[in-house]
Amino acid sequence: MTLDERKRNILGSIIRDYVETAEPVGSRAMVKKHDLKISAATVRNEMADLEDMGYLEQPHTSAGRIPSERGFRYYVDCMMEKEPPGEREYALLQQLFEQNIEDWEQVILGIAHFLSQMTRYTSFVIVPAVKFTEFRNLQLLPLDQGKALLLLVCDMGVIMHRIISIPEFISSQDLQAITGLFNQAFIGKRLEEVKRSDLQLIRENLSQRRQIIDNALEAIDNLLQNSRDEKVMVSGALNILNEPEFKDMDKLKRILNVLEEDDSLRQIIPGELGEAVDIKIGRENPLEEIKEMSLVVAGYKSFGELGKIGVIGPVRMEYWKAVGTVETVRDIIEDYLKGLG
C-alpha cells in the first residue's frame, strides 16, 4: 500500500524518534520537534489512520504511538536513505586491511569489531571454507630481519599468506633456493600427495636451514587446515545489554545463547543472498528466540564461495546506518579479495 506524502513524513518522524528514545511518540511532541507545518490535531488524526492501516501501534499505557513491524518494513522498503560510514570511519576500515594484510583472520576479527563499534549492535562475519585441489606456486619473500612472508597460491586463484620466522643469516638468495626446492615438491600436487621422502630430501639438502623449512611446513599446514573450515566471528554480543527492550534476564539469556552458538547463528542467516542487503525484521526471523530482533546481512564473494557479514539488533534499529555500514564493508571485502586473486 502506498502512503501519501503527509503520512510518510509522519511515519518517518515517528520511526526516527522512537529509535532514538525507545519511548512512544505523541502528536504534540512531534509538532514541537519537527517542522511538519500542521497542527497536533491533524497529526493525531493521521496517526490514528496509520494505526488502522497497521503501520503504528499504541501501547496500553501510553497515548503515544510506536512503529509496528509492518511500519518498519514499509520504511525500510519504501522510504529509507542509507547512511554509509563517514570519511574518518572509511579510512579506519581501510587501515584494517593495510595493517593486517599478512593475516586474513586478523582482518576478519577487525571487521567484526569495526561493525559492532560503528552500529553499536552485535556483528558477525562468516568466512566460507576455501575449496581447492592443487598447489600452483609458493613464494618466500624477505621482510624485516628474522621474518619472511610465505605466499601459497592454489588453484581458483586462492592466495594464502603467513609471516614466518627465519634465521638472521638467511639471505634473499637462500630464500630463492628454498622456494625452488619447495615448488619442485609441491606444484601440481595435493597436500596428501606430497611424499614424506620429498620433504625429507629438502631438509637434507638444506641442513643448515632446517629451521626455516620446519617453520614453513608448519605454516603451510596451518593455512590449509584453517582454510578447510567455515569460520564464524562474532563481536559486540554484550551490546544488547544497552537496549531497554532486553532488560528481562530470561529473554536476554535466550538471545545471548543464540549469539554465542555458531550453529544457532547459522540458522538465522539466509542460506542464499543476492546483491542487495537482506533485512529480516522481528517475526520474519526463523528462530523464536530472536523474533524481537532484526537482522541485516549481506553476502560477499570469497574465491568462488559465499561469505556473509551483518549485524543483529533490536527491531528498533537504526536501519539506515546498519545497512549503509554493512554494504560498505561488504564492498571493501570484495575489492580486497579481488586484489588477492
Curated annotation (Swiss-Prot):
InterPro entries linked to this entry: GAF-like_dom_sf, HrcA, HrcA_C, WH-like_DNA-bd_sf, WH_DNA-bd_sf, WHTH_transcript_rep_HrcA_IDD
Top-level division of the source organism's lineage: Bacteria
A Pfam match: HrcA
Keyword Transcription regulation: yes
Molecular functions (GO terms): DNA binding
One GO-annotated biological process of the protein: negative regulation of DNA-templated transcription
Gene3D superfamilies reported for this sequence: 3.30.450.40, Heat-inducible transcription repressor hrca homolog, domain 3 (3.30.390.60), Winged helix-like DNA-binding domain superfamily/Winged helix DNA-binding domain (1.10.10.10)
UniProt keyword list: Repressor, Stress response, Transcription, Transcription regulation
Summary of the function given for this chain in its UniProt record: Negative regulator of class I heat shock genes (grpE-dnaK-dnaJ and groELS operons). Prevents heat-shock induction of these operons.
Annotated family: Belongs to the HrcA family.
The protein, known as: Heat-inducible transcription repressor HrcA
Organism field: Syntrophomonas wolfei subsp. wolfei (strain DSM 2245B / Goettingen)
